Curated annotation (Swiss-Prot):
InterPro entries: Acyl_CoA_acyltransferase (IPR016181), ODC_AZ (IPR002993). It comes from Candida glabrata (strain ATCC 2001 / BCRC 20586 / JCM 3761 / NBRC 0622 / NRRL Y-65 / CBS 138) (Yeast). It holds the Pfam family ODC_AZ. Interacts with ODC and thereby sterically blocks ODC homodimerization. GO terms for molecular function: ornithine decarboxylase inhibitor activity. Ornithine decarboxylase (ODC) antizyme protein that negatively regulates ODC activity and intracellular polyamine biosynthesis in response to increased intracellular polyamine levels. Binds to ODC monomers, inhibiting the assembly of the functional ODC homodimer, and targets the monomers for ubiquitin-independent proteolytic destruction by the 26S proteasome. GO terms for biological process: viral translational frameshifting. The gene is OAZ1. Belongs to the ODC antizyme family. This is Ornithine decarboxylase antizyme.
Amino acid sequence: MEKKVSHVIDFLSNDEVQRQLGDPSISGISFSFDIRTLLKKHSGGNPQFFNYSMRDSFHEWCADIELGANTNELVTELLWDIIYLTEHQFLLPYYHGEHKKFQKKLVKRVGNHLNSLVNNSASKPTGSMTVNVRHVWRNVGDRYTLLYLPLYFKELIWCKANGSIFHVIIPHTKEHVIHEHKEWLLAILEMAGYWNLSHVRLYLPRDDLTNIQTLLKNLHWIGANLLPNENRNECNENDDITLSDETYIILECEC
Protein backbone atom coordinates (compact mmCIF):
# COMPACT_ATOMS: atom_id res chain seq x y z
CA MET A 1 0.00 0.00 0.00
CA GLU A 2 2.68 2.49 1.05
CA LYS A 3 4.78 1.49 -1.95
CA LYS A 4 1.92 2.32 -4.33
CA VAL A 5 1.37 5.71 -2.71
CA SER A 6 5.10 6.46 -2.90
CA HIS A 7 5.14 5.45 -6.57
CA VAL A 8 2.36 7.91 -7.37
CA ILE A 9 3.94 10.72 -5.34
CA ASP A 10 7.32 10.17 -7.00
CA PHE A 11 5.67 10.40 -10.41
CA LEU A 12 4.01 13.69 -9.45
CA SER A 13 7.33 15.02 -8.19
CA ASN A 14 8.98 15.20 -11.61
CA ASP A 15 10.77 18.42 -12.50
CA GLU A 16 8.11 19.73 -14.90
CA VAL A 17 5.28 19.31 -12.39
CA GLN A 18 7.31 20.99 -9.65
CA ARG A 19 8.20 23.84 -11.99
CA GLN A 20 4.56 24.44 -12.80
CA LEU A 21 3.49 24.29 -9.16
CA GLY A 22 6.02 27.04 -8.52
CA ASP A 23 4.08 29.30 -10.89
CA PRO A 24 1.74 31.53 -8.81
CA SER A 25 -0.90 31.43 -11.56
CA ILE A 26 -1.24 27.64 -11.18
CA SER A 27 -3.25 26.36 -8.21
CA GLY A 28 -3.55 22.66 -9.04
CA ILE A 29 -2.57 19.77 -11.26
CA SER A 30 -4.35 16.67 -12.49
CA PHE A 31 -3.41 13.36 -14.08
CA SER A 32 -6.13 11.49 -15.95
CA PHE A 33 -6.46 8.39 -18.12
CA ASP A 34 -9.09 6.29 -19.86
CA ILE A 35 -9.11 2.74 -18.51
CA ARG A 36 -8.76 1.44 -22.08
CA THR A 37 -5.18 2.73 -21.93
CA LEU A 38 -4.41 -0.58 -20.19
CA LEU A 39 -5.16 -2.46 -23.41
CA LYS A 40 -2.31 -3.14 -25.83
CA LYS A 41 -4.46 -1.93 -28.71
CA HIS A 42 -6.48 0.79 -27.11
CA SER A 43 -8.62 3.68 -28.30
CA GLY A 44 -8.72 5.62 -25.06
CA GLY A 45 -6.02 8.15 -25.87
CA ASN A 46 -2.86 8.68 -23.86
CA PRO A 47 -2.75 9.63 -20.17
CA GLN A 48 -2.74 13.39 -19.72
CA PHE A 49 -1.36 15.88 -17.23
CA PHE A 50 -3.29 19.11 -16.65
CA ASN A 51 -2.69 22.29 -14.72
CA TYR A 52 -5.38 24.49 -13.22
CA SER A 53 -4.24 27.96 -14.16
CA MET A 54 -5.45 31.53 -14.51
CA ARG A 55 -6.09 32.46 -18.15
CA ASP A 56 -8.05 35.46 -19.38
CA SER A 57 -9.08 36.33 -15.80
CA PHE A 58 -10.53 32.92 -14.93
CA HIS A 59 -9.21 29.48 -14.01
CA GLU A 60 -9.36 26.51 -16.35
CA TRP A 61 -7.79 23.09 -16.78
CA CYS A 62 -5.19 22.90 -19.55
CA ALA A 63 -3.19 19.90 -20.75
CA ASP A 64 0.11 21.78 -20.59
CA ILE A 65 2.38 19.33 -18.75
CA GLU A 66 4.54 16.83 -20.65
CA LEU A 67 4.66 13.27 -19.31
CA GLY A 68 8.37 13.04 -20.02
CA ALA A 69 10.44 10.81 -22.23
CA ASN A 70 11.13 8.06 -19.69
CA THR A 71 7.63 7.42 -18.37
CA ASN A 72 6.34 4.88 -20.90
CA GLU A 73 8.04 1.95 -19.18
CA LEU A 74 6.52 2.86 -15.83
CA VAL A 75 3.11 4.15 -16.86
CA THR A 76 1.23 0.81 -16.85
CA GLU A 77 2.28 0.06 -13.28
CA LEU A 78 1.41 3.63 -12.32
CA LEU A 79 -2.10 3.36 -13.80
CA TRP A 80 -2.74 0.15 -11.89
CA ASP A 81 -1.53 1.81 -8.69
CA ILE A 82 -3.94 4.72 -9.21
CA ILE A 83 -6.85 2.35 -9.89
CA TYR A 84 -5.98 0.32 -6.79
CA LEU A 85 -5.66 3.36 -4.53
CA THR A 86 -8.90 4.89 -5.83
CA GLU A 87 -10.96 1.73 -5.33
CA HIS A 88 -9.26 1.19 -1.96
CA GLN A 89 -11.06 4.31 -0.70
CA PHE A 90 -14.23 2.18 -0.48
CA LEU A 91 -12.59 -0.75 1.32
CA LEU A 92 -13.88 -1.06 4.87
CA PRO A 93 -11.18 -0.46 7.52
CA TYR A 94 -11.66 -3.99 8.87
CA TYR A 95 -10.31 -5.40 5.58
CA HIS A 96 -7.37 -3.02 5.09
CA GLY A 97 -4.92 -5.80 5.87
CA GLU A 98 -6.15 -8.00 3.02
CA HIS A 99 -4.28 -6.22 0.22
CA LYS A 100 -3.53 -9.27 -1.91
CA LYS A 101 -7.10 -10.55 -1.82
CA PHE A 102 -8.44 -7.08 -2.63
CA GLN A 103 -5.98 -6.66 -5.51
CA LYS A 104 -6.87 -10.06 -6.96
CA LYS A 105 -10.57 -9.20 -6.98
CA LEU A 106 -9.87 -5.78 -8.46
CA VAL A 107 -7.77 -7.17 -11.31
CA LYS A 108 -10.64 -9.50 -12.18
CA ARG A 109 -13.19 -6.67 -12.09
CA VAL A 110 -11.02 -4.45 -14.28
CA GLY A 111 -10.44 -7.32 -16.71
CA ASN A 112 -14.17 -7.98 -17.01
CA HIS A 113 -14.83 -4.30 -17.63
CA LEU A 114 -12.13 -4.07 -20.31
CA ASN A 115 -13.50 -7.18 -22.02
CA SER A 116 -16.94 -5.62 -22.14
CA LEU A 117 -15.50 -2.44 -23.65
CA VAL A 118 -13.59 -4.44 -26.27
CA ASN A 119 -16.83 -6.20 -27.18
CA ASN A 120 -18.53 -2.80 -27.57
CA SER A 121 -21.01 -3.53 -24.82
CA ALA A 122 -21.77 -1.70 -21.60
CA SER A 123 -19.86 -2.92 -18.60
CA LYS A 124 -21.89 -5.57 -16.87
CA PRO A 125 -22.49 -4.31 -13.33
CA THR A 126 -22.58 -6.58 -10.34
CA GLY A 127 -24.81 -6.74 -7.34
CA SER A 128 -26.84 -3.72 -6.30
CA MET A 129 -25.56 -1.68 -9.23
CA THR A 130 -28.19 -3.33 -11.39
CA VAL A 131 -31.04 -1.98 -9.29
CA ASN A 132 -29.90 1.30 -7.80
CA VAL A 133 -28.08 3.97 -9.76
CA ARG A 134 -27.19 5.67 -6.49
CA HIS A 135 -24.52 3.09 -5.77
CA VAL A 136 -22.65 3.03 -9.07
CA TRP A 137 -19.50 3.73 -7.05
CA ARG A 138 -19.22 -0.08 -7.08
CA ASN A 139 -18.55 0.02 -10.82
CA VAL A 140 -14.98 0.08 -12.09
CA GLY A 141 -14.32 3.52 -13.56
CA ASP A 142 -14.22 4.26 -17.27
CA ARG A 143 -11.73 7.01 -16.44
CA TYR A 144 -9.52 7.62 -13.41
CA THR A 145 -8.33 11.07 -12.40
CA LEU A 146 -5.91 12.21 -9.74
CA LEU A 147 -6.27 15.79 -8.50
CA TYR A 148 -3.78 17.76 -6.47
CA LEU A 149 -5.06 21.07 -5.07
CA PRO A 150 -2.40 21.96 -2.49
CA LEU A 151 -3.97 25.27 -1.49
CA TYR A 152 -7.01 23.48 -0.08
CA PHE A 153 -6.20 19.86 0.74
CA LYS A 154 -3.53 18.01 2.67
CA GLU A 155 -3.68 14.95 0.43
CA LEU A 156 -4.27 13.80 -3.14
CA ILE A 157 -7.85 13.57 -4.39
CA TRP A 158 -8.79 10.22 -5.93
CA CYS A 159 -11.49 10.34 -8.61
CA LYS A 160 -13.16 8.08 -11.15
CA ALA A 161 -15.90 8.50 -13.72
CA ASN A 162 -18.43 5.94 -14.83
CA GLY A 163 -21.33 6.77 -17.08
CA SER A 164 -21.96 10.48 -16.63
CA ILE A 165 -20.95 10.66 -12.96
CA PHE A 166 -17.65 11.97 -11.59
CA HIS A 167 -16.94 10.33 -8.21
CA VAL A 168 -14.59 12.41 -6.06
CA ILE A 169 -13.25 11.18 -2.72
CA ILE A 170 -12.60 14.36 -0.77
CA PRO A 171 -9.74 14.28 1.78
CA HIS A 172 -9.64 16.47 4.86
CA THR A 173 -9.40 20.16 4.04
CA LYS A 174 -6.73 22.42 5.45
CA GLU A 175 -8.18 24.18 8.49
CA HIS A 176 -7.30 27.71 7.43
CA VAL A 177 -9.23 27.36 4.13
CA ILE A 178 -12.24 25.48 5.46
CA HIS A 179 -14.62 28.19 4.24
CA GLU A 180 -13.08 28.47 0.76
CA HIS A 181 -15.12 25.57 -0.58
CA LYS A 182 -16.25 27.59 -3.58
CA GLU A 183 -12.75 27.64 -5.09
CA TRP A 184 -11.95 23.94 -4.83
CA LEU A 185 -15.48 22.92 -5.75
CA LEU A 186 -15.29 24.98 -8.96
CA ALA A 187 -12.00 23.27 -9.82
CA ILE A 188 -13.66 19.86 -9.45
CA LEU A 189 -16.76 20.87 -11.41
CA GLU A 190 -14.63 22.24 -14.23
CA MET A 191 -12.61 19.02 -14.37
CA ALA A 192 -15.86 17.05 -14.69
CA GLY A 193 -17.08 19.47 -17.34
CA TYR A 194 -13.87 18.98 -19.31
CA TRP A 195 -14.82 15.32 -19.72
CA ASN A 196 -18.47 16.18 -20.51
CA LEU A 197 -19.80 14.56 -17.34
CA SER A 198 -23.18 15.69 -16.03
CA HIS A 199 -22.91 15.08 -12.27
CA VAL A 200 -20.31 15.18 -9.52
CA ARG A 201 -20.57 13.08 -6.39
CA LEU A 202 -18.50 14.23 -3.45
CA TYR A 203 -17.59 11.60 -0.86
CA LEU A 204 -16.79 13.47 2.37
CA PRO A 205 -15.16 11.66 5.32
CA ARG A 206 -17.69 11.49 8.14
CA ASP A 207 -15.08 12.62 10.66
CA ASP A 208 -14.34 15.85 8.74
CA LEU A 209 -17.16 17.55 10.62
CA THR A 210 -16.26 21.17 9.92
CA ASN A 211 -16.07 20.67 6.18
CA ILE A 212 -19.31 18.69 6.15
CA GLN A 213 -21.16 21.33 8.16
CA THR A 214 -19.90 24.09 5.88
CA LEU A 215 -21.01 22.30 2.73
CA LEU A 216 -24.37 21.26 4.17
CA LYS A 217 -25.09 24.90 5.01
CA ASN A 218 -24.43 25.77 1.38
CA LEU A 219 -26.36 23.00 -0.36
CA HIS A 220 -28.55 25.56 -2.10
CA TRP A 221 -25.60 27.53 -3.46
CA ILE A 222 -23.84 24.50 -4.89
CA GLY A 223 -27.12 22.96 -6.06
CA ALA A 224 -26.32 19.71 -4.27
CA ASN A 225 -28.45 16.91 -2.94
CA LEU A 226 -27.61 14.72 0.02
CA LEU A 227 -27.63 11.09 -1.09
CA PRO A 228 -28.30 8.14 1.22
CA ASN A 229 -25.63 5.54 1.73
CA GLU A 230 -26.01 2.02 0.44
CA ASN A 231 -28.29 -0.14 2.57
CA ARG A 232 -26.07 -3.05 3.55
CA ASN A 233 -29.11 -5.16 4.39
CA GLU A 234 -30.20 -4.98 0.76
CA CYS A 235 -26.86 -6.10 -0.70
CA ASN A 236 -27.22 -9.39 -2.54
CA GLU A 237 -24.81 -12.30 -2.76
CA ASN A 238 -22.93 -10.71 -5.69
CA ASP A 239 -21.96 -7.62 -3.72
CA ASP A 240 -18.47 -7.51 -2.29
CA ILE A 241 -19.05 -7.15 1.45
CA THR A 242 -15.55 -5.72 1.92
CA LEU A 243 -16.62 -2.55 0.07
CA SER A 244 -18.91 0.17 1.37
CA ASP A 245 -19.66 3.89 1.15
CA GLU A 246 -20.67 4.06 4.82
CA THR A 247 -17.60 6.03 5.90
CA TYR A 248 -18.70 8.97 3.73
CA ILE A 249 -21.35 11.66 3.55
CA ILE A 250 -22.34 11.84 -0.13
CA LEU A 251 -23.34 15.02 -1.95
CA GLU A 252 -24.32 15.15 -5.62
CA CYS A 253 -24.49 18.23 -7.82
CA GLU A 254 -24.89 18.94 -11.52
CA CYS A 255 -21.97 20.25 -13.53
